Amino acid sequence: MFSQQEVHDIIDRVIGYSKLPGCEVSVQWTEDDFIRFANNGITTSAFRVTQQVSITSTTADKRRGNAVVGEITAEALKNGVKQAEDLAAISHPNPEDMPALPAQSYPSLSNFDGYTASVRGDVMVPQVQAVLAGALKNKLVAAGFIQRSANAVGIGNKAGLFGYHTYTDSSLSHTMRNAEGTSSGWASQSSVSVKDLDGEQQARVSIEKCLRGINRKKLDPGKYTVVLEPAAVADLVGWLGAAFDARDAEQGQSFLSKPSPEAGQGKGAGPTFLGEKLFPEIITLRSDPFHPKLASTPWGQSLLPSEKISWIERGVVRNLYYDRFWAEKAGKKPTPDTANLVLDGQDNSLSDLIASVERGLLVTRFWYIRVVQPKTWQLTGLTRDGVFMIENGKVTDPITNFRWNESPAEVLQRTTKLTQPIRVNTVDSGPDVAPALITTDFNFTSISDAV
């Protein structure tokens, strides 16, 4: 693993080769093991060490070029700088490009597990064996992926900025299908520590869903009360983070914009719902890089120090995301990215939520999520790996999958109950922490034949 001094030396070397006014360097070192399995057997395993240096060069008139190199040699770094500077020379100026950040005070995060960093892939084999044993015992077919990684990252620029961080991560996800391929169950788990992965417990979840999902019934599309499991909630919440962009809100292009003839007309910032209660009191959405379950970094894409920020607090919109350009234009303090999202929960179990629903649907997770209407943050997607009828507080029949159209903001506005949150790896935005929830009038638009 690259030490702090080694990362510093690499950045200094790159900056030393730079001839343009601006040079920003990002260094990534990763050691990882993975095991892939399918058809009830291990198909692939690997141990890899990768290193990458990303170089961004900036001219005096705000032209930028970027190059990425995978070798840490003088020749490779020099060529990377030259490529970045050549690209900058032919790029169009970006009037919104901001001056390089000076030295920052980055927080110290505790998401490095020494055991996970030191072991190899053999420690993950028992978890895979537990999943495969469960599949064989129940005459199902398992496929999945398990991995662990140790990472060192660093950033620096000509203005004196420097940051260094190490973290570990691990995950196990898999699906179970019946031999006929008509039913699918899924389970996933991720953690900073590979010791937390539990293949036997995961297999129980996926097996139960797969066996319960055989002989699915068709249900007419429409609006239903739903219990969304944490994976489904995290997929929605991950998309919602981008909707807190202050520029969109102030220019009338967001669900956080108030109706105004001035918004987006070049007459300054329009009114927003900042400080107003748009959600039930049980809804609190925040960014928390210090959360022990998240493999966060001390900085975001803007390179500003990561910090705890409440976006929604007890139903009230507390903050908007200001990038450096829009913050300067609006006279505001820039804020870090809407990353490391945590949707707080309540002291309920998934069983408690199901028991409180007279008639509705239990949804495992979503996929193929796309934006339909950016202003209202309307999304569309599909359910997968288990949709079940809830009747009189009990899970009954398996149901075919659906296509849905929904705004995650409106889903939270209609939420009535939550469980305790867990870490979930989302389909599109990486790990977040989310609970299961009950929401009403979830809009299913058509039946999907997907399993």
PLM feature segments, named:
Residues 250, 256-451:
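Dual-mode signal for accessory low-complexity, basic/Gly-rich regions
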Residues 48-60, 163-189, 311-313, 385-392:
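Short beta-strand elements
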Residues 2-16, 22-34, 78-165, 197-234, ...:
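Acidic low-complexity segments
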Residues 64, 171-197, 275, 317-339:
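Short, acidic (Asp/Glu-rich) active-site segment that either coordinates a divalent metal cofactor
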Residues 162-262:
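Internal metal/ion-chelating core segments
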Residues 33-51, 147-172, 315, 368:
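Conserved alpha/beta core surface patches that mediate binding of polyanionic ligands
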Residues 33-89:
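N-terminal alpha-helical targeting/anchoring segments
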Residues 13-15, 42-46, 119-122, 130-136, ...:
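A generic local secondary-structure boundary/capping motif
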